[in-house]
Amino acid sequence: MTDDRIIGAGATREDDAADASIRPKRLADYLGQVPVREQMEIYIQAAKGRGDALDHVLIFGPPGLGKTTLSHVIANELGVALRVTSGPVIEKAGDLAALLTNLQPHDVLFIDEIHRLSPVVEEVLYPAMEDFQIDIMIGEGPAARSIKIDLPPFTLIGATTRAGLLTAPLRDRFGIVQRLEFYSVEELTRIVRRSASILGIDCTADGAGEIARRARGTPRIANRLLRRVRDYAQVKAGGHIDEPVAQAAMKMLKVDPEGFDELDRRLLKTMVDYFDGGPVGIESLAAALSEERGTLEDVVEPYLIQQGFLVRTARGRMATHKAYRHMGLKPKNPPQDLFAEVPDVG
C-alpha cells in the first residue's frame, strides 16, 4: 500500500531525484541519529585500520528516515563502491550470484526491503555473508552438480521498515544492527536549512522551523515540503521563505501544525461525529470514509497512533483526549482507563 500524499513517508520519483542532489556524503554531514552516527564512525575507522571489510549492517526503522542515505555515507567513508538493489528485484538465486561475483574487495552491497527476499535467495545469501562463498548448481537433473565460488570480503547493508519480518537466520548474520528514530524539530530544522542552502533557496531559520514542525519527524517529508513551499514563495513572496510565508504555503497545502492532512483530520472527525469517539471497527470506519481498509491501517493510522491521537483496543479504534483537543472539542466519551479498579458490586 503506497502513500502518495504530500505528508506520506514513501519515496516518489521526484524525491529520489531531489535526494540525490542534497544527500550527505560524510558522517559529519549526516544530521540527527547521533548514537548511530557515533557508533558507525567507530566501526568504520576500526575496519579501515585493520584493513578488513566492515561487518554486515542491518538498518531498520520507519520509511523516510535516511536508511538509503546512510548506506551511501558508509560506502563513501569506507572509500569503496556501493551496489544498490532491493529484495523484490532479486528473484532468483542466479540474480544474487551475479551481484556477489561482481563485487570488488570491501565493496558494499545495499539491499533495500531485504525482508522481501525469497527463501531460495536467502539460502544463497547465508554462506555468502558468513564464509564469503556461494554454492551454485550447474546443469539439471542427474547431471547437475554444485560448485563453490569464493567471494571477496564485502559488506552487506540490509534496510527494512519491517524488521519483524526478517527470518532469524538472516537477522543473526548481521554484526551491526542500527535502528533509525524519528527526528526532533530542531534536527529537522537543521536539515531543512542545509537543503535550502544546497538548492539555493532563501529560507530563514523561522521559516525552516515552521516546515520542520509539520514534517512528522521525517527528513523525506521535510525536504518535500521545502520544495512545495519554495514554489509558493517563488510566486507569492519573491522567493523568500520566512515563518508567515511557510504558514501560508502550509495552509494552501492543507497541512496543519501537527503535520496532518485532510485524510488524517477526516478520520478523526468521522470517529468523533459519527461514532462518538469510538470504539469503532476498521470496516465501519473504512465504509464511512469511503477508503480502503488497507489505506487506513497502513497509511493513515500509524502516525495518529504514534502521536497519541488514536488508540487501538480489542473493541476497535478510539479517539483520545488529544484528538478532541486538536479539533477544539470537549471529549464526549473519554477513553476508559484500562488500569482503573473495577468497583466491587458483590
UniProtKB/Swiss-Prot annotation:
InterPro entries: AAA+_ATPase, AAA_lid_4, DNA_helicase_Holl-junc_RuvB, P-loop_NTPase, RuvB-like_N, RuvB_C, WH-like_DNA-bd_sf, WH_DNA-bd_sf
Residues covered by region (Large ATPase domain (RuvB-L)): 2-183
Enzyme class: hydrolase
GO function term, MF aspect, one: ATP binding
CDD domains assigned: AAA
Catalytic activity: ATP + H2O = ADP + phosphate + H(+)
Domain of life: Bacteria
Binding, Mg(2+): 68
Sequence positions that bind ATP: 22-23, 64, 67-69, 130-132, 173, 183, 220
CC annotations in GO: cytoplasm; Holliday junction resolvase complex
Enzyme nomenclature, EC number: 3.6.4.-
SMART domains found in the cross-reference section: AAA (SM00382)
Subcellular compartments: Cytoplasm
Biological-process GO terms, alphabetical: DNA recombination; DNA repair
Major localization class: cytoplasm
Subunit structure: Homohexamer. Forms an RuvA(8)-RuvB(12)-Holliday junction (HJ) complex. HJ DNA is sandwiched between 2 RuvA tetramers; dsDNA enters through RuvA and exits via RuvB. An RuvB hexamer assembles on each DNA strand where it exits the tetramer. Each RuvB hexamer is contacted by two RuvA subunits (via domain III) on 2 adjacent RuvB subunits; this complex drives branch migration. In the full resolvosome a probable DNA-RuvA(4)-RuvB(12)-RuvC(2) complex forms which resolves the HJ.
Free-text note regarding domains: Has 3 domains, the large (RuvB-L) and small ATPase (RuvB-S) domains and the C-terminal head (RuvB-H) domain. The head domain binds DNA, while the ATPase domains jointly bind ATP, ADP or are empty depending on the state of the subunit in the translocation cycle. During a single DNA translocation step the structure of each domain remains the same, but their relative positions change.
Record's function text: The RuvA-RuvB-RuvC complex processes Holliday junction (HJ) DNA during genetic recombination and DNA repair, while the RuvA-RuvB complex plays an important role in the rescue of blocked DNA replication forks via replication fork reversal (RFR). RuvA specifically binds to HJ cruciform DNA, conferring on it an open structure. The RuvB hexamer acts as an ATP-dependent pump, pulling dsDNA into and through the RuvAB complex. RuvB forms 2 homohexamers on either side of HJ DNA bound by 1 or 2 RuvA tetramers; 4 subunits per hexamer contact DNA at a time.
Family: Belongs to the RuvB family.
Protein name: Holliday junction branch migration complex subunit RuvB
Organism of derivation: Stenotrophomonas maltophilia (strain K279a)
Lineage start: Bacteria, Pseudomonadati, Pseudomonadota, Gammaproteobacteria, Lysobacterales
